[in-house]
């Protein structure tokens, strides 16, 4: 992806988030974006929209199907994308919208990797740790299970990491012995 394309994607995303923020609809916009991204991930919609073999009329039909359950702002955004023939960048734009929402609302996705699935109490404690240590609000809590950690957990938020895993501690101990 070129710098020009990246700038275009970011500008579309920033504009959509700005409009939603002005109208106090960030939560609605975020729900719409997550629903559409889920559709992208369960289908090959991204390939269809970026393919030159698929006629523009077919792309219009595909995006019209996405408009049914969305807010006015998302529907206007999708129409603008169609009007300017930027469908090929829609997936990246939606990802950028989520990033912009996170920046504006200071609410980031939290990835927690542990050796066992977390209980509800542990999840709430993770949210508290994130709020205290990173000074951000926890958005979605993405839970991963990795038995190789042996114990402890790894919390990752906005490119910052807390690693209390036994595996890392054993590696550090091994390095100290050398």
Swiss-Prot record:
Tree of life domain: Bacteria
Protein name: ATP synthase subunit delta
Any one Gene Ontology cellular component term annotated for this protein: plasma membrane
UniProt main location, coarse: membrane
Gene (UniProt): atpH
Subcellular location: Cell membrane
Keyword Membrane: yes
Family note: Belongs to the ATPase delta chain family.
Keywords: ATP synthesis, Cell membrane, CF(1), Hydrogen ion transport, Ion transport, Membrane, Transport
NCBIfam families: ATP_synt_delta, PRK05758.2-1
Record has Metal-binding as a keyword: no
GO terms assigned for molecular function: proton-transporting ATP synthase activity, rotational mechanism
């Amino acid at each position: 992806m070129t710098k020009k394309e990246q700038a275009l994607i970011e500008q579309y995303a920033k504009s959509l988030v700005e409009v939603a923020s002005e109208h106090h609809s960030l939560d609605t916009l975020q729900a719409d974006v997550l629903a559409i991204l889920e559709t992208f991930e369960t289908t090959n919609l991204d390939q269809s929209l970026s393919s030159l073999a698929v006629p523009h009329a077919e792309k219009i039909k595909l995006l019209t199907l996405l408009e049914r359950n969305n807010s006015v702002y998302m529907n206007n955004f999708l129409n603008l994308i169609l009007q300017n023939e930027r469908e090929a960048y829609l997936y990246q734009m939606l990802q950028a919208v989520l990033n912009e929402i996170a920046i504006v609302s200071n609410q980031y996705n939290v990835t927690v990797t542990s050796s066992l699935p977390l209980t509800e109490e542990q999840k709430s404690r993770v949210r508290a740790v994130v709020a205290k240590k990173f000074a951000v609000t926890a958005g979605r809590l993405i839970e991963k299970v990795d038995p190789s950690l042996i114990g402890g957990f790894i919390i990752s938020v906005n490119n910052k990491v807390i690693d209390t895993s036994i595996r890392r501690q054993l590696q550090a101990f091994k390095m100290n012995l050398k």
